[in-house]
Amino acid sequence: MEISSHQSHLLQQLNEQRRQDVFCDCSILVEGKVFKAHRNVLFASSGYFKMLLSQNSKETSQPTTATFQAFSPDTFTVILDFVYSGKLSLTGQNVIEVMSAASFLQMTDVISVCKTFIKSSLDISEKEKDRYFSLSDKDANSNGIERSSFYSSGWQDESSSPRSHLSPDQGTGIISGKSWSKYNYHPASQRNTQQPLTKHEQRKDSIKKAKHLRLSQPSEMTHYKSSKREARTSDSSSHASQSEEQAQMNAEMDSTPVSYQYGQGSDVTSRSFPDDLPRMRFKCPYCTHVVKRKADLKRHLRCHTGERPYPCQACGKRFSRLDHLSSHFRTIHQACKLICRKCKRHVTGLTGQVVQEGTRRYRLCNECLAEVGIDSLPIDLEAEQHLMSPSDGDKDSRWHMGEDENRSYVEIVEDGSADLVIQQVDDSEEEEEKEIKPNIR
């Protein structure tokens, strides 16, 4: 028979003992603040403490003291309370620090909870942004209707001039008279008798999209404004020659300058600025960094979470970005650095010499040459010159770097117990060809 309350009761008793410093045999010093705890509890809850206490398992009679500088006392308080109570107090301000400390202490459960907390915070922020964008779209549409009705009152006076020759029933917008008949902006007597055209309703969404694009580009709006004014003064008699689509677009382009022409207050004028339109931006919930794509936000969050998903296949070092891994592999593992065959130290043309034994050629540093004896080993000066700077006649030799800049390959030459790795890297035209790296396995 299992009693479910026994585990929680046991944790409560251990936590009470910790608070009263009863049977505490371990002291943790974090930036000058001392925390009392029990070694068996720390051993069971943290992989780092398990490794640390296993080394001192023979000295159980002496109290253990551990010192940490990787995190703050407040962060360790949250983790220690979780160990003794099972409750993790996470906030938007401490989740990154707690996750970093849990990663240091090798507490996988805490790391998983922190990742879930961060993901839920991002989901909430995304929902809030979607709600803001939907409200902004509604406000933009309502503002557009108000502007259109306001502008129609101003254009009615101008459309009453003798220049408007077409009747509203024809459904064709006039450039000079600025007739708004195709938008159904008519007086009350005409609205009851005139029916909207199907083609105009179909193009309503496309006109709104063009209007939003125009508002996001003020320079193009100014260009259309000046061009329309010139067309209005130079060609006042070209009415019926314009097509219906051109008249509709031109009427929309003229709607924004009206707010400046009539000057009916800052409310109407301010609504025409592109700042009121929604913009797709992703803001980091832990700093002020703002990006345009969600993928960039995920990559930025790695600097807060400490996640490094890209390991180096050669040395095991992990990186947070793929380009950093590529740069590391090129500069560290693919660099043609000359090493001594005996001591494996880096040598240059001054600190080492090329030695030839039969058909094998390798490089030794001056110290190793002194230990082995320079007289007992033949020094191949010609081979050293070829290794340092290959000449034109040695292009077919396997001891120099190829000049094909479009390829990168590794040629392995097996000779006895030594392997010579000849590697080509992409160099600029101004750089000299690098020396060969003998890699002794």
Curated annotation (Swiss-Prot):
Key words of the record: DNA-binding, Isopeptide bond, Metal-binding, Nucleus, Phosphoprotein, Repeat, Transcription, Transcription regulation, Ubl conjugation, Zinc, Zinc-finger
Gene3D superfamilies associated with the record: Classic Zinc Finger, Potassium Channel Kv1.1, Chain A
C2H2-type ZnF: 282-304, 310-333
Polar residues: compositionally biased ranges: 146-170, 178-197
Recorded coiled-coil stretches: none
Alphabetized PROSITE patterns for the sequence: BTB, ZINC_FINGER_C2H2_1, ZINC_FINGER_C2H2_2
GO molecular function, one term: RNA polymerase II cis-regulatory region sequence-specific DNA binding
Entry protein name: Zinc finger and BTB domain-containing protein 8A
Gene assigned in the entry: ZBTB8A
